[in-house]
Design a protein with these regions (language model features):
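Tubulin/FtsZ superfamily GTPase core signature
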Residues: 1-388
Length: 388
């Protein structure tokens, strides 16, 4: 396990760091390292020494060793938070000299949920562009874990420039219920990696249209919820196909690009890409984005994509305007649509129902919920490591 040291080389380039917090965040960082994402330094921090020892991140350290003795946060966000506060000075030293930091975590557990807001807070105090990319739990993980995740996300959004939330439950809609659990988590890691690669490649990799760090900072500093989508197209109409897939991503929360205050577009293709294709992508984005949105487009030349063309869209500032709410799901929308009359006092039970609405197609079944909790406990420990 290496000690952290400040690297002063390449002063002309933006220094980007990716920090995986907790088990889920650490696994995401390890996946990015294995995928060979360039232009960023990867760090994994955790309260669980055993999980950290197995992680392949080049830089890592134990959070809150005095509090947890390296045994983890026990799914308690308060312990995760205290662990991060214990090592606040160390986090500050680790982040000094950084231009942009990605913080990735699985929300709903102890370390990721509790420590990620503290890491973000430290980064913002150092005037670092801070983007969090986090996942929300599967329904099978239980309502308690989902409630913890939502509370953590609510706290985290106050400490970052942009927050991208990926609901794991959406994976079931895209991959199908027969998809293996390991494959589902791998796909979640792919989405997390795609967000980091989409932004870092635009800054670090050469292309027909180069974008500097100041351009990225302009877009990503539009505080609020962000969305990320990736699309791949092939054939003569590949540019339009890729762009439309990117803005209609099914792995994201039900939010509209129309509310975005800033849009960052990464177009990745081989050397045969044409200006006409770049224009086609731009036209598609213009049709979806707000007319006053700041749109920054960059290209990355990568022969590994073959004859395909890939478009990654990062839309920011979703929630910055008074008329825009934070990320919401379909069932919450239905409840809000009926709330047109004079508000009445609510009981605790009614307030809890509004904050955690049931799905539209069924009434919550207590026995079924208890069964889901039991199923989660039956998941092997090597899989549950992903969830902390």
């Amino acid at each position: 396990m290496s000690e952290w040291e400040i690297i002063e080389e390449n002063k002309g380039n933006a220094i980007i760091k990716v920090i995986g917090v907790g088990g889920g965040g650490g696994n995401a960082v390890q996946h990015m390292v294995e995928e060979g994402i360039n232009g960023a330094e990867f760090i994994s921090i955790n309260t669980d020494k055993q999980a950290l020892d197995k992680n392949k991140a080049p830089h890592k350290f134990i959070l809150g060793k005095e509090i947890t003795d390296g045994l983890g946060a026990g799914a308690n966000p308060d312990i995760g938070r205290e662990a991060a506060l214990e090592d606040r000075d160390r986090l500050t030293e680790m982040l000094k000299g950084t231009d942009m930091v990605f913080i990735t975590a699985g929300m709903g557990g102890g370390t990721g949920t509790g420590a990620a807001p503290i890491v973000s807070q430290v980064a913002k105090e150092l005037d670092i562009l801070t983007v969090a990319v986090v996942t929300k739990p599967f329904e099978l993980e239980g309502s308690k874990r989902m409630k913890i995740a939502k509370e953590g996300i609510k706290e985290l959004i106050e400490e970052v420039d942009s927050l991208i939330t990926i609901p794991n439950q959406k994976l079931l809609e895209v991959l199908g219920e027969d998809c293996a659990m390991i494959e589902a988590f791998k796909e979640a890691n792919n989405v997390l990696a795609g967000a980091v690669r989409g932004i870092s490649d635009i800054i670090m990799c050469p292309g027909l249209i180069n974008v500097d760090f100041a351009d990225v900072k302009t877009v990503m500093s539009e505080r609020g919820t962000a969305m990320m989508g990736t699309g791949i197209g092939s054939g003569p109409d590949r540019a339009r196909i890729a762009a439309e897939k990117a803005v209609e991503s099914k792995l994201l929360e039900d939010i509209s690009l129309k509310d975005a205050k800033g849009v960052l577009v990464n177009i990745t293709a081989g050397t045969e890409i044409t200006l006409g294709e770049i224009t086609a992508v731009g036209d598609c984005i213009d049709n979806f984005a707000d007319k006053d949105a700041i749109i920054v487009t960059g290209t990355v030349i990568d022969e590994k994509v073959g004859n395909d063309l890939k478009v990654t869209v990062i839309a920011t500032g979703l929630g910055a305007a008074p008329a825009t709410t934070k990320t919401i799901n379909i069932s919450t929308v239905k409840l809000k649509e009926t709330k047109e009359r004079e508000p009445l006092p609510l009981s605790d039970a009614a307030r809890q129902l509004l904050e955690n609405p049931p799905s539209l197609d069924r009434v919550p079944d207590k026995n079924k919920q208890e069964k889901k909790e039991e199923e989660f406990l039956d998941i092997p420990s090597f899989v549950r490591t992903q969830l902390d």
